[in-house]
Amino acid sequence: MTGAQLIMACLKAHHVTTLFGYPGGAIMPTYDALYDAGLDHLLCRNEQGTAMAAIGYARSTGKVGVCIATSGPGATNLVIGLGDAMMDSIPVVTITGQVASPLIGTDAFQEADVLGLSLACTKHSFIVQSADVALQGDLIQALNALKQDLDIEPWREQIRNFKAKLDFTYVENQGNRPIDPWALLNSLSNRKPNNAIICTDVGQHQMWLVQHILRVARHCGFTVTTMEMTLIETQVRLKITVKSDRTLDLLVNQLVKLPDVLMVN
C-alpha cells in the first residue's frame, strides 16, 4: 500500500465521501489513489476555491470538509481558507503535496515552507515523511510527559465543579454521523435553568447544524445570542467580549440575574 492509498483508506474509515481539489504535479499520486478509492471529487478553479468550498460543505452538512492541493504555491493558496476555518471553528482537513524528501529545504521547484505558514492558521499541522512513525502515539506520549510537570489538580477541581453544576453529556452510538439537532435540543431543554442563554461563535452560528439548533432552541424557551465569551467559573462570573451594540443590548437585558450559560462550541 502506498502513502496515497493509505490516505484514501483513512478518509474512507472516517466516512469521508466528498473532496474538493485542484491537481498539480506533486499531488498526482494522491489523485490516482482517489480515483481508485471511488470517492467523489469536485474540481475547483483554484486552490483558494477548494478551501472555501470545503468550508461551505462543512457549514451546510455538519460534516468535515476535505480539500487537496499540490505543493508550493498550490498549498500556500489555501492559507486564507485555513485562517477563515480556524477563526470560525469550521472542521476542515487539508492534504497537500510536497517535493521529494531529499529536496525539502533546498528551494526546489514548487517548494514552500507550508508547515511554517500553516502553523498560525491551523490547530494541527505536520509533515509525514515516514509511514513507520506512529504520529498519534507520539503525540499522546508527548502530552503525557508534559502533564507530569504540570500542577493540574486545581483545573480538574474547577472542571468537576462545573460539570456538577451543568450536568450534560450527549452520547449516542452513531459513529461519525452528525449530531441529531432535535435530540440535542431535547436533552438541553430537560436540563436548562429557566434563564439560560445559548451562546455560539460567529462561524458556528453559520453552520447548518447550529442554525437548526438555534432555530429550534427559541421554541424551547432558550435565549440565543452570538458572541465570543470566556466563562470564569467563580460563582458564575462572566467575562464577555461583544462584537456589536445589538449583542451588548441583548446581554444587558438578559444578564441582570447572571444566568447560567450553555455554550455551543
UniProtKB/Swiss-Prot annotation:
Residues 204-247 are annotated as: Thiamine pyrophosphate binding. Its cofactor is Mg(2+); thiamine diphosphate. It comes from the Bacteria. The keyword Lyase applies. Pfam families: ACT_5, TPP_enzyme_N. The keyword Magnesium does not apply. InterPro entries: THDP-binding (IPR029061), Thiamin_PyroP_enz_TPP-bd_dom (IPR012001), TPP_enz (IPR045229). Truncated acetolactase synthase; no longer catalytically active. Belongs to the TPP enzyme family. This is Putative uncharacterized protein HI_0737. It comes from Haemophilus influenzae (strain ATCC 51907 / DSM 11121 / KW20 / Rd).
